[in-house]
Amino acid sequence: MRDGVRNYIVYKVDGNAHGHQTELWALLLDPTGMNTVGSPEMILKNDQEWEHGIVEGQWFVKVGNEFYLFYSGCGYANDCYSIGIAKSSSALGPYTKKAQNPILRTRSPMTAKSW
């Protein structure tokens, strides 16, 4: 992710694979993009019922001074796979989830399981 000046790496801690909380973390990179700066920050965790224990597939859009974090919940192989959004004034959070999440919801089992 890039905020216009700085680069970040954003990653998922796959807790759902082990029956634990799933988290998204962000870490600032140096100008070369090859080294980290500081400590990672947890920016999102699965805490809404529709997510079914999973947050993943994160991507960001910066509009003005706000960061919009789009993410998927419920797992790609399920017909409940959906997209949520959270907002922050800082790339490293904290992010606030939209109360009306998910903003897009899978309705057909064929959509999620077409592979």
Regions found by a protein language model. Name each.
Residues 1-115:
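Carbohydrate-active catalytic/glycan-binding domains of CAZyme proteins
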